[in-house]
Amino acid sequence: MNDKKILFFDIDGTLLTPPPFKVPEGTSRALTKAHENGHLLFINTGRTKVMMPSALSELHFDGYIYGCGTHIYMDNKLLFFRTVPNLLCKETVDLLRKYKIEAIFESNTEILYDGASPAQSEFGVKMRKEIPMVDITKFNREDACTYSYDKFLVHMLPDSDVEKFRSFCNDHYTYFDHGDGIWEVTQKGTSKATGMEFLLDRLSIPKEDCYAFGDSPNDLPMLKAAGVSVAMGNAYGGIEEHCTYQTSAVDRDGILHALEHLDLI
């Protein structure tokens, strides 16, 4: 067995298959063996804590980085958190209405939507049926200063003013364009990479002992910051060009093959 390493895993497309969102048996077996070998295992996801899939509940992880670096836990203890300031939250909601852009806001404890937005689509209706959400308009004048979120997802519609919102995002946020009008918008200064680097510093683990596994453009900061980076076989957006190794797809035991190839199990 090699010396102890620290491993960071994206969720969607890396540990979980596409719908119905299952953990492949080979992945479960590989993670169990890696834990038995003494390696530290962390989830590093764009999802906020409230959006954690139940399919991962039976797997062992030493900690979690949620919301692209906005909440960091280890051994069930919160080590770091950062949310979007309330004034910026309110400005963002106002501009999303003005620019006719649909949005879903993600915090550590709840998912919000804007029932007063002029931008409504079947996509948003479907999401609200699948995921419990709170209408942001419930926050009236008295408690409007009490809400915040960590990141948000936007859905561009045919009449959305995309370029004006892009300019606003460039000033205040970081965003990832996932195609089909879907953007993932995150806080400036936090990312999967900053979350990972926080833990490396806290645990005094050198970069060369850090391994990262992902499949999408929002994994790129994490993959670039790791000592060893692994792109899944189903990776997109050209991220494999920046990785040490590309394994097979998530539903073809990509994690199992990668951990074996890297002599971690």
List each model region and its residues.
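Conserved acidic, metal-coordinating active-site core of Asp-based
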Residues: 99-213, 217-225, 234
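Glycine-rich phosphate-binding loop signature in dinucleotide/nucleotide-binding domains
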Residues: 2, 39, 198-209, 262-265
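Short, structured coil segments at secondary-structure junctions
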Residues: 59-60, 68, 168-172, 225-226, ...
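Residue-level signal for inorganic ion chemistry
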Residues: 34, 45, 152, 223, ...
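Phosphate- and divalent-cation-binding pockets in alpha/beta enzyme and binding domains
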Residues: 50-54, 164, 195, 221-222, ...
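Asp-based, Mg2+/Mn2+-dependent phosphohydrolase catalytic module
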Residues: 225, 229-265
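Active-site phosphate-binding/coordination module
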Residues: 26-122
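Asp-based phosphoryl-transfer active-site loop
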Residues: 5-20
